[in-house]
């Protein structure tokens, strides 16, 4: 295969970064209505992905299988160009550093997309809470014989209590710091997955590239704010006994902060610093404006 043919499905790193910068700049100008609609979709689909992962994990007694299927939610967000606040934690700062946006526009985007993501997760949480407590799947049972839907509901409540009270609130300041650190790792991996998907121009390439880091994040049990918006909204609705004040202070706040650092520093800043400047004899100096526009559109900046 010739070099030109082999590069048809591959976006060079400097071109990728230019596309990410352009996308961040365009995202900064998206209307509040579209931020909320696209954010709603992303939150809703991740809520459904969590239910899928838990159901499959409990049914098969193999949680890794659930983690392996979980990334379908992120894949659809990438393919449809929706708004996920954790991805924007990397893109908007890159645009600001390049002079394509401002910090005011960045914070505006983050706030509205965060709200849109939460609305999406909350709607799915209410729907699933009703569904999980109002019926059973014939013939499907967990390891103690309870109907699988009841087992999923119990698992959500257990995760809600463990990831707010047991792991964090009970440890005080150290717990807050641990939630922050796990948020850093989670969004480092998630943004890596989204960025890897953009390196390929083919749908199969995008799916494979984004699947691996996101499966890793899910398997490691790290903290992603949009996933947590679903779990820690559904948990109290189902009756976990955890209140939303505890959720905000001991999970959503430190995890959001950690996700910002993971995306902005470990993906945005590092990629911007090393690939924004084209290196002679390593990366081509010719800039592909068409590719930049394509990448910007692909990242949801339409």
Positions of predicted regions on the chain:
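Alpha-helical transmembrane segments and their helix-helix packing motifs
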Residues: 2-302
């Amino acid at each position: 295969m010739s070099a030109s043919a082999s590069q048809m499905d591959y976006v060079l790193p400097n071109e990728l970064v230019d596309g990410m910068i352009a996308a961040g700049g365009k995202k900064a100008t998206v209307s509040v209505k579209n931020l909320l609609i696209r954010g709603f979709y992303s939150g809703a689909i991740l809520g459904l992905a969590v239910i899928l992962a838990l159901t499959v994990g409990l049914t098969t007694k193999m949680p890794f299988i659930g983690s392996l299927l979980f990334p379908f939610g992120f894949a659809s967000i990438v393919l449809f160009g929706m708004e996920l606040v954790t991805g924007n934690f990397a893109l908007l700062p890159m645009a600001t550093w390049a002079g394509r946006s401002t910090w005011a526009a960045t914070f505006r985007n983050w706030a509205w997309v965060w709200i849109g993501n939460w609305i999406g997760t909350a709607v799915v949480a209410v729907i699933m809470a009703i569904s999980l407590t109002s019926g059973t799947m014939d013939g499907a049972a967990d390891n103690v014989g309870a109907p699988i839907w009841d087992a999923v509901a119990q698992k959500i409540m257990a995760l809600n209590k463990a990831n707010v009270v047991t792991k964090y609130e009970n440890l005080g300041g150290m717990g807050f710091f641990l939630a922050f650190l796990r948020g850093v790792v989670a969004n480092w991996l998630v943004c890596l997955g989204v960025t890897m998907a953009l390196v390929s121009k083919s749908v199969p390439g995008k799916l494979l590239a984004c699947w691996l880091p996101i499966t890793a994040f899910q398997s490691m049990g790290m903290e992603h704010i949009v996933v947590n918006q679903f779990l820690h909204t559904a948990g109290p609705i189902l009756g976990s006994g955890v209140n939303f004040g505890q959720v905000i202070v001991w999970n959503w706040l430190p995890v959001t902060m950690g996700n910002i650092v993971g995306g902005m520093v470990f993906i945005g800043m590092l990629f911007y610093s090393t690939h924004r400047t084209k290196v002679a004899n390593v990366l081509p100096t010719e800039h592909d404006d068409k590719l930049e526009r394509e990448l910007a559109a692909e990242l949801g900046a339409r």
